[in-house]
Amino acid sequence: MADDKEMPAAVVDGHDQVTGHIISTTIGGKNGEPKQTISYMAERVVGTGSFGIVFQAKCLETGETVAIKKVLQDRRYKNRELQLMRVMDHPNVVCLKHCFFSTTSKDELFLNLVMEYVPESLYRVLKHYSSANQRMPLVYVKLYMYQIFRGLAYIHNVAGVCHRDLKPQNLLVDPLTHQVKICDFGSAKQLVKGEANISYICSRFYRAPELIFGATEYTTSIDIWSAGCVLAELLLGQPLFPGENAVDQLVEIIKVLGTPTREEIRCMNPHYTDFRFPQIKAHPWHKIFHKRMPPEAIDFASRLLQYSPSLRCTALEACAHPFFDELREPNARLPNGRPFPPLFNFKQEVAGSSPELVNKLIPDHIKRQLGLSFLNQSGT
């Protein structure tokens, strides 16, 4: 199918109902090729929210299954999610295939984002394990978290974007290959230093403490906190900080990390001076997880879930953590013996990183393979 991410989006006559309907749209031909008509049969709704709906659809011309996110579009503004998705291209970020606008009988304008279809979410995988009264095997925790951080490294470093709503529902998993893709850029934004942002973003259990403190000049480290919460949830089988409201959310965090110091509060929000918290000691990390939890898993969680945003490791530093060393072993495989999805085909996300970090990220056996391919290319 032709990829028209860069083309202006066509407007088609949509339907008020979704499932069972056929939506036809035209995509522009590239390099002088004729335009193509593409038709989608809407099959079932797979997600709903304040934004609109996501439905599974089949392309009638190719038989390919896609996900279409349909959102109400304000005619006065460009859609930020569309602008961001058009420039992103990474194995751990869901791919935008193309987009079109549709109208309803009430003359409402909807934007339809046509994306690759990934059948499962980390949320549903977690529910599967908890309903079976099981913990997720550690190799899957490592594999999923590594890919999440790799996707974040690309989003943060290359696209310059903060996701701002990282949670298990927005992390898609292919059950056959175990490839993970970050999705839903409806809250995402390119953060500009010195420019204020809203603090009321991110789903509560995964919301960084600086957001609870009302900070407006936060950084991409809010995504690192959210990823730390996801890691803890995969290890525990339940959310680490299950707050019932914004204030209770902070209480849940304090019960684990202890009361933040004045300096930590200043790091989170320099304008927050109302310091009236009960003095609670930090709960040791090793007591939060079960006795057999590997020390590198506990160390990793503690490096992500820090009050001071600047003390949290970056996404690439997270990928290099010893917690993921098992994935870098030469004979590492999925439990069923199949190979892992590609984990080390780094490109833009390592640009500007120190040689030491790149050295840690790329295993020796991969370096040897790359070295051989370079030798072959040079004809020696």
UniProtKB/Swiss-Prot annotation:
The record's active-site residues are 165
Q: Where in the cell is it found?
A: Cytoplasm, Cell cortex; Cytoplasm; Nucleus; Cell membrane
Residues with the modification Phosphotyrosine, per the entry, are 200
Reaction(s) catalysed by this chain's protein = L-seryl-[protein] + ATP = O-phospho-L-seryl-[protein] + ADP + H(+); L-threonyl-[protein] + ATP = O-phospho-L-threonyl-[protein] + ADP + H(+)
Q: Which CDD domains does this one have? A: STKc_GSK3
Question: Out of the domains of life, which is the source?
Answer: Eukaryota
Where in this protein does the record say Phosphothreonine is found? 104, 220, 261, 314
Q: Which GO terms describe its cellular component?
A: cell cortex; cytoplasm; nucleus; plasma membrane
Chief place of localization: cytoplasm
Q: Among its keywords, does the record have Transcription regulation?
A: no
Q: Found in which tissues?
A: In the two outer cell layers of the developing seed coat and restricted to the suspensor cells in developing embryos. Mostly expressed in stomatal lineage cells with asymmetric cell division (ACD) potential. Observed in small cells of non-protruding hypocotyl cell files and of developing cotyledon epidermis.
Q: Deletion: any effect?
A: Increased stability of SPCH and formation of excessive stomatal and non-stomatal cell.
What outcome follows a substitution of residue 69 to R?
Answer: Abolishes kinase activity. Altered BASL exclusion from nucleus
Q: Can you give the residue ranges of the Protein kinase domain?
A: 40-324
Question: Per the UniProt entry, what are the Gene Ontology biological process annotations, in alphabetical order?
Answer: brassinosteroid mediated signaling pathway; detection of brassinosteroid stimulus; leaf morphogenesis; multidimensional cell growth; negative regulation of brassinosteroid mediated signaling pathway; positive regulation of protein export from nucleus; protein autophosphorylation; protein phosphorylation
| PTMs per UniProt | Autophosphorylated mainly on threonine and serine residues.
Signal peptide segment = none
**PROSITE patterns, sorted:** PROTEIN_KINASE_ATP (PS00107), PROTEIN_KINASE_DOM (PS50011), PROTEIN_KINASE_ST (PS00108)
Q: What topology in the membrane does the UniProt record assign? A: Peripheral membrane protein
Q: Does the keyword Phosphoprotein apply?
A: yes
Which InterPro entries does the record cross-reference, listed alphabetically? Answer: GSK-3, Kinase-like_dom_sf, Prot_kinase_dom, Protein_kinase_ATP_BS, Ser/Thr_kinase_AS, STKc_GSK3
Ordered alphabetically, the record's keywords are: ATP-binding, Brassinosteroid signaling pathway, Cell membrane, Cytoplasm, Host-virus interaction, Kinase, Membrane, Nucleotide-binding, Nucleus, Phosphoprotein, Serine/threonine-protein kinase, Transferase, Ubl conjugation
Indicate the family of this protein. Answer: Belongs to the protein kinase superfamily. CMGC Ser/Thr protein kinase family. GSK-3 subfamily.
The miscellaneous comment for this protein is: Unlike other GSK3 kinases, does not require a priming phosphorylation event or the presence of a scaffold protein to phosphorylate its substrates.
What name is this protein filed under?
Answer: Shaggy-related protein kinase eta
Q: Which organism is it from?
A: Arabidopsis thaliana (Mouse-ear cress)
